[in-house]
């Protein structure tokens, strides 16, 4: 059996596509956010959707790499969000991206969040 991360029980096709990545992905849940706070690790938030071409490219080039996953797992609490399942979360961080960069966002969207308040930092 393949090694899986915390996404293997999800119903979203997009999240399930990432359930066997070496990245230790977690879904966006209160339990996951609480664990990130307890561990005091910054959150690496990745938002995308199953029909997104560039999301698949990023997954193949980054999230399937053991070397990149090792760095992500060591330094971050990794959370993956399907924008089609959680448009509320997507909207919050797309707006935050636009405010921070003065440019519209897109997908995949990667943000670094403070685990204490889920606010982006850069």
Residue map of PLM features:
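Replace the tail clause
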Residues: 1-122
């Amino acid at each position: 059996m393949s090694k899986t991360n915390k996404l293997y029980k999800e119903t979203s096709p997009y999240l399930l596509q990432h359930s066997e990545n070496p990245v230790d992905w977690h879904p966006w849940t209160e339990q996951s956010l609480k664990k990130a706070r307890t561990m005091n690790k910054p959150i690496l938030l990745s938002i995308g959707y199953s029909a997104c071409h560039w999301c698949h490219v990023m997954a193949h080039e980054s999230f399937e790499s053991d070397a990149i996953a090792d760095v992500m797992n060591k330094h971050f609490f990794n959370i993956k969000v399907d924008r089609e399942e959680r448009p509320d979360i997507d909207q919050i961080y797309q707006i935050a991206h636009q405010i921070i960069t003065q440019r519209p966002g897109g997908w995949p969207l990667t943000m670094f969040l403070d685990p204490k308040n889920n606010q982006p930092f850069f």
